[in-house]
Amino acid sequence: MTNLLLQGVGMTSLRTRERLIQRLRDQGVTNLRVLDIMLNTPRHLFLDEALAHRAYEDTALPIGHGQTLSQPYIVARMTELLLGAAGKLNKVLEVGTGSGYQTSLLAQLVPEVYTVERIKPLQDKARERLHQLGLRNIRYRHADGGFGWPDMGAYDGILSTAAPQVVPDELLKQLAPGGVLVIPVGGREQQLHLIIRDTEDTEKFVTQILEPVKFVPFLSGTAR
């Protein structure tokens, strides 16, 4: 991949990205690692060419198959929550690969990233993009995200990019002691949840309900 493609041109320029990062700061995002990685990650590469000029708007955008690339603010917010609430993050599970953009941020922050996607064409395209960006610390699974990836757990952090009606028990079981789950929960009305597994009583989970959000629904099964 050429430097020109990575840097972007016109609406994907560094100045455009810098304006987005300033908006995120204005909205309360403070983690400098998250902001720096978002500044330097080419979000336009995770969209079809027709939408690439809108990549640095603070809005969700369609990626096909009824899915979306999440609003940059909520991506930054959830990533910041994951980093801030957990201890040392060595291994993270992402539920919902989608475009691969959130995956790319996690892979620059965490040594091991495991990502599960139910829609095969989306994951294939995401894998190709992430490979082009040189990110090699990611493992992929095509499966129902509600079951997580138990064979590879336990995880220091789990981040879900879709909203179930209730938190799946399987995801809670795959958290390591002290592990953190960041997940939107609900139907028409959704709330962002931060759930931490107790380090001593591992049957105990502490839940914080943070703010209203809007995500695509958490669906069961797989699609090809």
Swiss-Prot record:
Q: What is its EC number?
A: 2.1.1.77
| One GO location term (cellular component) | cytoplasm
**Class of this enzyme:** transferase
- Locations listed in the record: Cytoplasm
Please give the biological process terms from Gene Ontology that the record holds. methylation; protein modification process; protein repair
Is-annotated flag, keyword Transferase? Answer: yes
Organism's domain of life?
A: Bacteria
Q: Which SUPFAM superfamilies does this UniProt record tie to the protein?
A: S-adenosyl-L-methionine-dependent methyltransferases
CDD domains noted in UniProt: AdoMet_MTases
Major location category of this protein: cytoplasm
Any one GO molecular-function label of the UniProt entry: protein-L-isoaspartate (D-aspartate) O-methyltransferase activity
Q: Which residues form the active site?
A: S70
Protein family membership: Belongs to the methyltransferase superfamily. L-isoaspartyl/D-aspartyl protein methyltransferase family.
* Known function: Catalyzes the methyl esterification of L-isoaspartyl residues in peptides and proteins that result from spontaneous decomposition of normal L-aspartyl and L-asparaginyl residues. It plays a role in the repair and/or degradation of damaged proteins.
Designated name of the protein: Protein-L-isoaspartate O-methyltransferase
